[in-house]
Amino acid sequence: MKTFLKRSLFLSLALVFALPIALSAPIKGLKISIIKKGKGAEVKKGDTAKVHYTGWLMNGKKFDSSKDHGQPFEFSVGGGRVIQGWDLGVEGMKVGEVRRLIIDSDLAYGKTGAGGAIPPNSKLKFDIELLAISKNAAP
């Protein structure tokens, strides 16, 4: 009986520690690092996220920042109005959290690049701070 209880306890602990790993499976082409933890509710698909961001090419050249524009940027998470790396990388953030996203070109601007500031096939780095969440009212 002792052996059975030990095995049950071991398996329970193994599941508890393995579950977060399984739930946060890596997304091909996207590396997420948490620079500062946030608090409260998580952003979900359909919510509006208000963020400050700075974006760099991998050579370190900054190409854009909401702080340079003097105001945060808002978008509907998962709505396809931003690059796919953002839709995937911002989902699950909490208010106050700062994430660094390293995004392969196929989840960014791909073969076309963007406006001369981002060359074709560019891997990008973003620091994104979640300032506020407006929850989606739909069920």
Predicted regions and their residues:
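Cross-family detector of peptidyl-prolyl cis-trans isomerase
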Residues: K2-P139
